[in-house]
Amino acid sequence: MTKLSRKLQTQKRHRRLRRYLIGDATRPRLSVYRSNNHIYAQVIDDSAQTTICSASTVDKELKEKSEKLPSDCNSSSIVGKLLAKRAIKKGIKQVIFDRGGNLYHGRVKALADAAREAGLEF
């Protein structure tokens, strides 16, 4: 039996998670995508199929403060705080966390912890 690549394992976990992670207007889904260099997070209303708010390490607001954010846990926590601030501004306090098939560790965990500290509940 051949071993699955890390990317295929992540995709398989994500498909399995998405079966039961469905966000709506009252409790939207906080989706996280992690690449090698950046991290992206967005709050999605699946019933209306719209993105309510988003934040990433390539965001204009973050680029103005610093030239380039490294791909580490500190950058992820900055993105988590920014996303929580934007979500609360739009009236969202509770979300469903979708880690996107990634393990809840490192940059994904840092983003989640920062969003919780900034006021989001999940």
UniProtKB/Swiss-Prot annotation:
Gene Ontology process terms (BP): translation
Q: Which organism is it from?
A: Prochlorococcus marinus (strain AS9601)
Keyword Cell cycle (UniProt): no
Q: Is the rRNA-binding keyword given for this protein? A: yes
Family the UniProt entry places it in: Belongs to the universal ribosomal protein uL18 family.
Source organism, top-level taxon:
Bacteria
Please give one Pfam family short name: Ribosomal_L18p
For this protein's source organism, the top of the classification is:
Bacteria, Bacillati, Cyanobacteriota, Cyanophyceae, Synechococcales
Q: What's the name of the protein?
A: Large ribosomal subunit protein uL18
